[in-house]
Amino acid sequence: MIKPKALQKNSTIGIVSPSYWLEEAILKKTTRFFTDLGYKIKIGASNNLQWGPFAGTPQERADDLHRMFTDPDIDAVMCARGGYGANRVLPLLDYELIRKNPKIFIGYSDITAYLTSITQQTNLVTFHGPMLTTYKNSWVDYNYNLMDRVLTGDNNINIKSPESLKTRILKEGKTSGPIWGGNMCLLINRLGTREALNTNGIILFIEDIDEYLYSFERMIVQMRTAGMFDKINGLIIGELKDMKDQDIKFGRNSDQIILDICGDLDIPIISNFPCGHGKYQTTFPISIKTAIDTSKIDAPVTITDSAVTKEL
């Protein structure tokens, strides 16, 4: 396992758009939040490129990622936004270059594909957490404070869900294991490729946005049939933002779908957890040991190990 250098208040954060491009007004507004906190910002070339909805061609986006990791002035790499397009860039990545230049790399949504692929190919810990678009409407202390604790090297971080989110325990239990996961569509899309996620012995977290209930069930069934749940130690369902139904009602909500398909698994299952596309976002360090204890109702998930190295 390779842990990147811890983030500091005077660190330089490189901003990259490896999928869709971000509107300039949002880019300026959101980076200002971080400069006001004392960070330095370096904008990558991809943020100034447009190839349809993408921030440049696949090769241009891959090149910008490589520059972010090799630039000695950049301490951490934050994605501006997600969208779509990682699957075109992954075959172009130089994983050995990334392994030799370990840095914090953080994002979510389409960035899931980058996170899981980079960590599996290089053993570098990556981070499923806030991007610039997280703050496009307003600053969210919950998200930044959790991210700051993870990226500065805290351990035994008990994650308390905001009361308004109403996180639910679907199956009780206690377990631990390395945390892996992200967006459901991206995890499923990697099946059958060299970037397919090895789920043996992990705590798996999944989330998605703007899906129909029937589509959500289809994805859960596919993941179960593909064996993705067979040997996991625990399952965390993130906030399923903007879940939809059809005119003819599906008849079951997302919790009922999970229990119908996965209820026979002898593992703890948590739903509506603050990770994903909702207002509140946990920073999960991919591959770092994490624990679930559903008897701790207020904070059932704990990131037990530090995810970064602290320089002396």
Where are these regions (language model features)?
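Conserved anion/nucleotide-ligand pocket segment
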Residues: 123-186, 192
